[in-house]
A protein has these predicted regions:
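Conserved active-site and SAM-binding loop architecture
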Residues: 1-148
Length: 151
């Protein structure tokens, strides 16, 4: 499969898919800490969603007809229900925080609506204020962890 892992600086998910033979690429606005710049698209993930010609950090071009799977980890600071309590300070709405939440929601929705057959958008329980779609499942790490495996 051709796999795009958006908002992934660590490359842990990318390396796991590569280990099983998939053509996986991480994409983030930060340089990767995972040691594989040849698998990393540095920059905004939104243009990469379309596929086509992508360039990895080793300056090599790769042509992706279409992605088979998108796994996205958009920043959750302004999207999660836990952060909603910071929208008001005293009795004053924190407009900058609201705007950051709206921008975060827009990024989330670009992933959610991407023209890719299999999509996973990982995020905590969303804030109701931002009208994000209802989550389809809740997975806690302890439900699947049988010891930590690092790839």
């Amino acid at each position: 499969m051709k796999v795009l892992i958006a908002c992934e600086e660590s490359q842990e998910v990318c390396k796991a898919f590569r280990l099983f033979g998939h053509e996986a690429y991480s994409c983030d606005v930060q340089e990767p800490s995972g040691g594989h710049p040849e698998w990393h698209i540095l920059g905004d993930a939104v243009p990469a969603l379309r596929g086509g010609q992508i360039v990895t950090m080793d300056d090599k071009g790769h042509y992706i007809d279409a992605w088979d799977l998108l796994i996205a980890h958009p920043p959750c600071t302004y999207l999660s229900n836990a952060g909603a309590r910071h929208l008001w300070k005293g009795h004053q709405l924190q407009e900058d925080r609201v705007m950051k939440g709206i921008l975060g929601r827009d990024l989330f929705m670009r992933f959610w609506w991407a023209d890719i057959p299999r999509i996973c958008v990982e995020n905590p329980v969303p804030s109701k204020v931002l009208c994000l779609p209802e989550y389809t499942q809740i997975i806690q790490p302890y439900q699947f962890e049988i010891g930590r495996a690092h790839v």
